[in-house]
Amino acid sequence: MISVCMATYNGEAFVQEQLLSILSQLSAEDEVLIADDGSTDATLEIIQSLKDPRIQIIPPSPRRLGPVYNLERVLSRAQGKWIFLADQDDVWLPGKVSKVLAEFEKTAADCILHDAFFYRKNQDGTWECGNRIFEIRPPHHGIFSNVKKNSYTGCCMAFRRNLLDKALPFPQSLPMHDQWIGLCAEKTKKARFLREPLIKYRIHLHNATDLANGKRASLGQKILWRWSLVRILLSRLGR
């Protein structure tokens, strides 16, 4: 069983296309878990209009949680053997699920990180695939290497349930869920990179991820967080 986990917020422009690209690759036994973080647009109505029994909308939180801890709510309810992360605004390319599952079987990996095409809007309003994420951010192994410079992009990740059990609950004040899950995978030494683009990673004004919107923390924030991250990882998973 596959659990696709998605956090949404004001994603009406793209969420239907993304969900259709996902659902077409799943079996009847799989699930798509969605937690909305208080959207003020038609995101929830669009999701509900699909009327697909595999989609489960998690009851809302009484307050906004932000993308990291909203996703944690979804992950904590996942029932599948394999967990796939999905952003609300991307597009899964045909064959993504089958190729990732084949890689799991071939490598005995706990976590697969695959490549993606950047998907940008042209001046004429059409969308076009550009460079690959791995060209901009070449992936690398190692805990301290990934604390220094993160390889992991959540929407390009899938992992086994045993890794999810290690990653939850998220540490407090976690700025990036993908880096945390990736570090948990690096600790097991069972992370693998699949160098084939399997999604269109959409770039637009309202991206929540740092890779797309160029947000930068201060040097002090980075140092404090990196030290905290290593300490938590070692205490959680052992030396």
State where each predicted segment sits:
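A conserved acidic beta->alpha catalytic loop
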Residues: 21, 36-45
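Glycine-rich, basic loop-to-helix element that forms the pyrophosphate-binding segment
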Residues: 60-78
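Short aromatic/hydrophobic "clamp" motif used to bind/position activated sugar donors
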Residues: 83
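Conserved donor NDP-sugar-binding/catalytic core segment of glycosyltransferases
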Residues: 97-127
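Conserved nucleotide-sugar donor-binding catalytic segment
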Residues: 138-212
